[in-house]
């Protein structure tokens, strides 16, 4: 007993020493790992095999090719045997040779974060690509992170008011939700995205992050210039409201598969450290999956359905689960979705749909009527379109608007064949109100003032509900439908009608 007590006392005396020893060992191990050198043994397109004699870097660590300009970062994807890792290149591998020296950085890809990234364009590894000098910050974060714990998440369902009538009324966005933005070329996706960025900054004081994943370089350049014109990015002072992260179509698949995570990391900093409600735009989420499938084949994984990677659901889930509301702030994500060959059952879009809370569908038919934003009020949906979340009045008005628009749609064939005169009085009233509602769903955007000549309007949700409720009740049946076009709240309809009447007189 005495011997045991003495031994335990001796152990206690040893504890501080053991602690020092383990700390020094950990420091030495970290130093050795950070200083680990390897050499390239094989290059297969975007995949590079690197051999290390000791201190094999863990999976997802960033390696750097020595003496190469511009900087080439490799991300560890697999361990082959005892001393070789298979990595994915974040840039072109042209000119790499066997035996070339590679350094282990000791941690995953780290990028600059914080307010200094606003108004700037960075690439997948966090380097500025807008020719405006380095990003002056010492705050960095790793692009790979765990999703927030359950205890950190906020379970309250809350609307993110965008100030855009058609969105707030018929397919409202949930704070921390994920929205799919469907639309072809030229129907106004970019303008809608810019208006959302602008409104969130003005109404909530929040920041936005735009991740261009595998998009056209020309489109990325146009968006940047349009944001400068629209005042979303300011080159003169620090009032920019958006950070841009680009990995274009011409980039290797490694960069396109990781650039969405880079954008998400910038957004996570604003949410977790500054308590912001952040908007994260991803254009296009399909390219994230596409890049993953390109890399997967090179890594030697057996493809699954339609040639996609076997880890498709895991890759998508690990990214989407990080986009959520916590008790500190929220990330609301708007994701443009390309549907290959218009096949909604394709594994890539089908996997994305499982994560969406709302869909905003832009329709060419509505754009052709000159109604912008060209959001389809019957095709767009939202998970929070529930009276328990949005309130009974909002729910009733939204359903009333959709019903009258659906009735008008079913009457259009009769009108086309027989004309308006053949309709009953009740149907004529339905058509008149539906056309007024259709025009009242249009709205002048602040970022498009330069092109339209109309002053932009941000409409509070209460005024939106009040306006549509009054139109449904027939309070404005006496006003001409042209008065409802391109205005903000319902009071402006009355003003516009009075003005038109005076001009006509």
From Swiss-Prot:
Compartments, record wording: Mitochondrion; Mitochondrion inner membrane
Enzyme Commission number(s): 7.1.2.2
Domain of life of the organism encoding this protein: Eukaryota
Cellular component terms per the entry's GO annotation: mitochondrial inner membrane; mitochondrion; proton-transporting ATP synthase complex
The keyword Cytoplasm is assigned to this record: no
UniProt family annotation: Belongs to the ATPase alpha/beta chains family.
Protein's name in the database: ATP synthase subunit beta, mitochondrial
Gene symbol of the encoding locus: ATPsynbeta
